[in-house]
């Protein structure tokens, strides 16, 4: 049985951004880390932006967390990507 991976992939993306705040993180680079395609990463990042967990600007490869990592809960991420 295949399980949805949106939540774990979103957590992976947020953690990667938190660990490398000063690096250029394109959707291609994030997709390589998550082992998926860039379009899927962009969809997740859009959901995370709408959920006010991520700040990013199209064409600017340095996304940032909208809050301190300690203040982002799994429930916040779940609501953003599955809500």
Where are these regions (language model features)?
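Short alpha-helical segments that sit at the start of domains
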Residues: 1-13
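Short helix-capping/hinge SLiMs at alpha-helix to coil transitions
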Residues: 18-22, 67-68
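A short alpha-helical element within helix-turn-helix/winged-helix DNA-binding domains
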Residues: 28-35
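Alpha-helical residues within the helix-turn-helix
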Residues: 32, 49-50
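Beta-hairpin "wing" of winged helix-turn-helix
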Residues: 51-66
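Conserved segment of winged-helix/HTH DNA-binding domains
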Residues: 69-83
């Amino acid at each position: 049985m295949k399980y949805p991976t949106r939540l774990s992939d979103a957590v992976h993306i947020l953690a990667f951004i938190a660990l490398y705040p000063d690096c250029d993180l394109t959707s291609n680079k994030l997709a390589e880390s998550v082992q998926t395609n860039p379009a899927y990463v962009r969809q997740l990042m859009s959901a995370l932006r709408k959920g006010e967990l991520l700040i990013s600007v199209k064409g600017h490869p340095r996304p940032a967390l909208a809050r301190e990592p300690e203040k982002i809960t799994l429930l916040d991420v779940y609501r953003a990507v599955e809500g």
